[in-house]
A protein has these predicted regions:
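Membrane-interface transmembrane helices that cradle and orient dolichyl/undecaprenyl
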Residues: 114-121, 155-168, 195-202, 349, ...
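Perimembrane helix-loop-helix junctions
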Residues: 186-220, 231-232, 336, 701-712, ...
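Aromatic/glycine/proline-enriched transmembrane-helix motif characteristic
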Residues: 202, 242-324, 407-416, 840-894, ...
Length: 982
């Protein structure tokens, strides 16, 4: 009885938390605009014109009357309280009923689980998964659709059919039908359930009559609710037109539903188009529907004979079978089938059904995210190479899940064989024990770590950039300066190396004053060599005018490429020995270096800074590199490359502490040393490498802290606590993504405190005080102090710079990021990052001979990103199925808190934003291998992964470094249509 009360309390806590989370998500997201505008407009029209005037001629309203009453109620509340359309409260009101229905579905899963496994914690685990299912969360709270309200009566219908309560089930089916026409997709399952009752019951005549009663009850809700809208005379024609018109309004193979037809390339393809051997998509869809329906009849007949007839199981099979194989499927049509699968998992205590529900929740979540995030963009119809790849890959994954469901259903129906869910999570059953001690560092391991770090440094610093560049500019900022120069030989080209400009101009004129060349100098031209044709004879005099800009150097070249000696020119021609032999990334800025690298120079020279959209710490580090090596390509890239090298031993140490297996740590170090993103991102003078480094350092300190707390208590863990706060502060001061990491650190910080309390050690009150005060000191005060201190270069430039100015900087940063609407040809959404589908094309060398190409791309390292994704999914599955570990949970938390905020970002984003998250992909991969039962096989697999990473790194090195290669070889590197570099 006591356990039952605890389970009930826990259930209410889960449901309450799930509802609150949905309301928060509803508040911070705007919803799918087309559905939102329809729902609001329909409610207002119903309120204004009444039911009889709602379906007026020419007015678009493709929903039946069932849910319109709820929308009318929402409109009434908005009218009473004068709530505008754009108000957050409007979003909350629209999401409230579907969210409550989602929570009711979770409670139903719990109830079914309690009937199957009374007294077990498994029903609570299943209910928690449904309550926080990302597919349902996104559908109800973010998209703000009504599928939760539509699915609930369907779920209750098939639950009652399990109990053989046929007539109430039929009434509930009618309620679902009154809300959405998609209920008709489950009509064959309802019919099978009623017809099998004729076979199962002794009184077959009664069962036969019940079929008619059930049909009448199923039609009652649509008819009763439709009567005020259509009137008695037009009731049946009006309803039939509404249901038939909705079904025929989207004549495409699939309408953003990532299923088998999408995997075949059928998204938004007209139904009459041929797909194979003259067969149209429509014919293929109907054929598949016939197959799925015949399968339903066979499974029903087989299960009746075996005494294992289960409406929930059949409804799950049929709902997902239709979504996977039929035509005209929208992205959200899978929602009822997914929840039915989870109900069936509870009914049959089968982990395979749970796994399918888990897998399809993820594929459906990505499906909805893809459609939602691209709404209103140029890629709204998912026609780009990236979006098409996502649709195909997710469609394949969804199809695989359905095949697994089919095997599971067959095994249960035909053989009565189930694979029970684990009894309970073993670690949760007892207080957490003190972790095993860390293995001692051996000499050979230290030498291996040093050797790997040295090798990484050699590869990273090689071909990084020139250590020579012009340093003395002609500075015409705020004025206009003219220099006269005489060429001592024939000229063919003019090379220009501008500095900082706030909207300036370079003009070259001949002796007669005729303009030969004119170039706008702005933010995009700084510290980058450019070449233009400039043909003239020896002895020609040029008048060169610089207006409101810096120009560090000019150079004249002859037809054979040699430097042309000049007379005069002042500062424009005073460093000819610093002119490079060829223009490339080795001597010029590229991508966002024109913002961050330039700002490092400005900070060093106490100039007004250009880049103010990120905190300054990363640019402070760039400034130090410039101070050491001058304003050269090597100088502005030095600090980032150094941090990229140091990231490798840090990852080694992090994985070693996490897994306690030196071999896994060594594998992680090698994989990161060969990772594409680490290499290219660290050699680019931007700030992401610094944020990533400190995020991983903070994670290392937090794992260290957690282990110390469990071993010796909070009072013995002050050092990692303090160092973790230091790392957190540095990460926030480098980039705001460090704040995302803080959420994960906070969860682990509080979680280990709870775990320590569960250990029941004496003196916990003193430990709690230490944790509380230490948390304030080291994770609030210290990071804030570091963040403020990172603005010291601002104060050096302007001693009057104070806290009010600092605060205005923060407001400006927030406003910039929250209102940014810029687009970029190589932007990508978070769900494409998981597979690295859209690299960022950083640089193309336009000064190469024909037949050669050179590019730099920010790419995903296939081994870490793909292998890590598989490992993360495995850890997540272990966790939600009750078989996880504290280490696995920690990695998932750190990964999730780094990635999830990007799911809510609608601004332009890039693949490199996933770089910090990829550190925990690496940790997940190492953890899965380190905890494998067969360690010999795990080590062999780890070695194979390292070998694969080396081969891939060598193959893709030109695309990561900018090394010129033959054009045919470059074209081979564009492996996917979505790559697009070179």
């Amino acid at each position: 009885m006591q356990r039952q009360k605890q389970n009930n309390s826990a259930l209410w806590l889960v449901l309450g938390g799930a509802f609150v989370l949905r309301m928060l998500l509803a508040t911070v997201t705007k919803g799918y605009p087309y559905d939102m505008s329809c729902f609001v407009a329909w409610g207002e029209k119903l309120l204004a014109d009444g039911p009889a005037g709602f379906y007026s001629d020419g007015y678009f309203a493709d929903y039946p009357p069932g849910y319109l009453l709820i929308l009318g109620l929402v409109a009434l509340v908005r009218r009473i309280f004068a709530i505008p359309y754009e108000a957050k409260l409007t979003y909350v009101l629209l999401a409230m009923v579907p969210s409550l229905c989602d929570c009711a579905a979770a409670a139903l899963v719990w109830k079914i689980g309690q009937e199957k496994l009374p007294g077990s914690r498994l029903p609570l685990l299943l209910a928690a998964f449904v309550a926080f299912d990302p597919l349902l969360l996104f559908d109800s709270a973010v998209w703000k659709q009504i599928d939760g309200a539509f699915a609930l009566p369907l779920l209750l219908c098939f639950y009652l059919l399990e109990k053989r309560r046929y007539l109430p089930a039929a009434l509930l089916f009618g309620a679902a039908l009154a809300i959405k026409p998609q209920a008709l997709l489950f009509g064959p399952v309802l019919a099978v359930c009623f017809l099998t009752a004729i076979v199962q019951e002794e009184n077959r005549f009664r069962a036969f009559l019940r079929c008619f009663g059930g049909a009448a009850l199923a039609l009652l809700p649509p008819l009763a609710l439709g009567l005020p809208f259509f009137g008695a005379a037009n009731l049946l024609p009006g309803l039939l037109e509404k249901y038939a018109g909705t079904a025929a309004s989207y004549p495409y193979a699939t309408i953003n539903g990532f299923n088998w037809l999408a995997a075949l390339g059928g998204n938004w393809t007209p139904l009459e188009n041929p797909v194979l051997l003259g067969i149209t998509w429509k014919q293929l869809g109907f054929f598949n529907i016939l197959l799925v329906t015949l399968g339903l009849v066979y499974l029903a007949a087989r299960s009746v004979r075996a005494g294992r007839f289960s409406p929930l199981l059949l409804a799950a099979y049929y709902g997902l079978g239709i979504f996977t194989l039929a035509h005209c499927m929208h992205e959200r049509y899978m929602v009822p089938g997914v929840v039915l699968t989870l109900l069936a998992a509870a009914r049959w205590d089968d982990i395979r059904l749970f796994a399918v529900g888990f897998g399809m929740s993820l594929t459906g979540f990505i499906n909805l995210c893809t459609v939602y995030s691209l709404t209103g963009s140029d890629d709204e119809w998912l026609t780009s190479a990236t979006s098409s790849s996502v649709a195909i890959l997710v469609g394949l994954a969804e199809t695989v899940c359905f095949v697994l469901l089919l095997f599971g259903v067959w095994d249960i129906v035909a053989n009565g064989h189930t694979l029970p869910l684990p009894a309970r999570m073993a670690e949760a059953a007892a207080p957490p024990a003190a972790p095993a001690p860390q293995p001692k560092w051996q000499r050979k391991e230290i030498l291996a770590l040093l050797a790997l770090t040295a090798a990484t440094a050699v590869v990273s610093f090689a071909y990084l950039g020139s250590r020579t560049a012009p340093q003395n500019p002609l500075d015409a900022t705020g004025t206009t300066l003219t220099e006269t120069v005489t060429a001592e030989g024939g000229t063919a080209a003019l090379w220009v190396y501008p500095g900082i400009s706030y909207g300036g101009r370079l003009t070259v004129a001949d002796a007669a004053g005729t303009t030969l060349y004119e170039k706008e100098l702005d933010y995009s031209t700084c510290f980058s060599w450019t070449s233009v044709e400039l043909y003239d004879d020896a002895g020609e005099v040029f008048h060169i005018t610089v207006e409101n800009a810096q120009v560090f150097e000019l150079a004249l070249r002859s037809a054979d490429g040699a430097l042309v000696p000049v007379t005069g020119g002042g500062a424009l021609f005073d460093e000819q020995t610093a002119v490079p032999e060829a223009i490339s990334q080795l001597n010029s800025m590229y991508f966002d270096e024109i913002y961050h690298g330039r700002t490092g120079y400005e900070q060093l020279h106490c100039l007004p800074v250009y880049e103010t959209t990120h905190p300054p710490l990363g640019k402070d580090f760039i400034m130090l590199g410039i101070a050491l090596f001058g304003m050269t390509a090597f100088g502005w890239r030095f600090a980032g490359t150094l941090f990229g090298v140091l990231l490798v031993p840090l990852a080694w140490c992090f994985v070693r502490r996490l897994t306690r297996r030196p071999w896994a740590a060594a594998m992680a170090g090698v994989l990161l040393a060969l990772d594409f993103m680490r290499f290219s991102q660290s050699r680019l003078a931007t700030i992401d490498i610094y944020g990533t480094f400190f995020i991983l350092l903070g994670a290392y300190c937090m794992v260290w802290y957690c282990q110390r707390v469990l071993a010796v208590g909070v009072n013995g863990a002050v050092l990692p606590m303090a160092l973790g706060g230091l790392a957190f502060g540095l990460g926030c001061a480098a980039k705001w993504t460090g704040i995302y990491a803080g959420a994960g650190l906070a969860v682990l910080y509080l979680g280990v405190l709870y775990a320590r309390w569960r250990q029941g050690q004496p003196g916990f009150g003193r430990e709690f005080r230490t944790a509380f005060l230490g948390g304030i000191a080291f994770y609030v005060v210290l990071p804030l102090s570091i963040y403020i201190a990172s603005y010291l270069p601002y104060w050096w430039r302007d001693p009057g710079f104070g806290l009010a100015d600092w605060w205005r900087c923060q407001v400006s940063m927030y406003n910039y990021h929250s209102t940014l609407e810029a687009t970029h040809p190589f932007e990508s959404r978070w769900y494409t990052w998981l597979l690295g589908l859209r690299p960022v094309w950083y640089y193309r060398n336009a000064y190469l001979p024909a037949g050669l190409k050179a590019s730099i791309a920010g790419m995903a390292g296939p081994v870490i990103w793909l292998g890590g994704l598989a490992a993360l999914l495995w850890l997540l599955w272990r966790q939600v199925s009750g078989r996880g570990s504290y280490a696995g949970a920690g990695v998932l938390i750190l990964y999730g808190t780094q990635l999830i905020p990007w799911m809510l970002v609608s601004r332009c984003t890039f693949l490199y934003h996933y770089f910090p998250s990829s550190m925990f992909c690496l940790a997940a991969l190492a953890l899965v291998l380190a905890t494998a039962q067969d360690q010999r096989r795990a080590k062999r697999l780890g070695a194979a992964l390292c070998a694969a990473a080396l081969v891939l790194f060598v193959w893709y090195y030109p695309a990561l470094s900018g090394l010129p290669i033959a054009a045919w070889r470059a074209d081979l590197l564009n492996l996917l249509p979505s790559f697009g570099f070179y």
